[in-house]
């Protein structure tokens, strides 16, 4: 099968998580399309074109991408007037998040942008509109390092905490600062949910070893995708610890929204006792 393009998933609404493939049936001499959602659904979705031809896709040039990155970097640091998703705004600032503005009036906050890097270089942004559950990419968004990796390196000694989403990473950092003694912690988020853990850990494995990272602490979603990701990590790394969530929270951001910030922080910091 040949990868064709990435589309929004119609079921979980994740942007660019539906990978389309072109397949060849040699016995019948026919080509056909199939797809798979690598985000929350984590399942095959069939032909996204319903038997029709694939639309022509414009391939962005390096100049196009460079201009997009320049525009994104010119946007202000994320700075809403109140907490967002229960997290104090200053935490978003410390993670380098940008505030993308409405293209209609140029002043109304429209989306939050999460910086994406590869080997230390800023290569793209993952953006989420403030008023709906959706994502869109700016610049390079595939084949990138986990969100927060460059931030984590100078903070890490022998332990790295891993979440399944950008909001969860920032929320977990917030929780641990309340429960612990440090002002910042080495937390990263998988680039495309739990289904990307194999790809992410394989991409950064040599750097983890070089920097003498010993423990990987997983604070993933309490769902099927999260459980599969935990099993995958246990096959890829020797010292993997799985942290439970307090109360009815299914992830770190839930813990914040439910008022379990300190409890979540204590569980994450006490990973060897969980």
Report the location of each language-model feature.
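Phosphate-handling DNA/RNA-contact segment within nucleic-acid enzymes
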Residues: 104-211
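Residues at the starts of beta-strands that form the adenosine-phosphate
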Residues: 186, 215, 239
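Acidic, metal-coordinating catalytic cores used for nucleic-acid/nucleotide bond scission
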Residues: 167, 193-198, 220-230, 247
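A charged alpha-helical hairpin associated with nucleic-acid processing machineries
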Residues: 244-247, 264-274
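Acidic beta-strand-to-loop metal/phosphate-binding motif
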Residues: 162, 211-225
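A generic structural motif
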Residues: 190-193, 240-251
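Non-catalytic accessory segments of DNA primases and related replication-initiation nucleases
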Residues: 1-111, 119-142, 223-227, 231, ...
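Short, surface-exposed amphipathic charged segments that create phosphate/polyanion-binding patches used
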Residues: 110-111, 201-207, 250-266
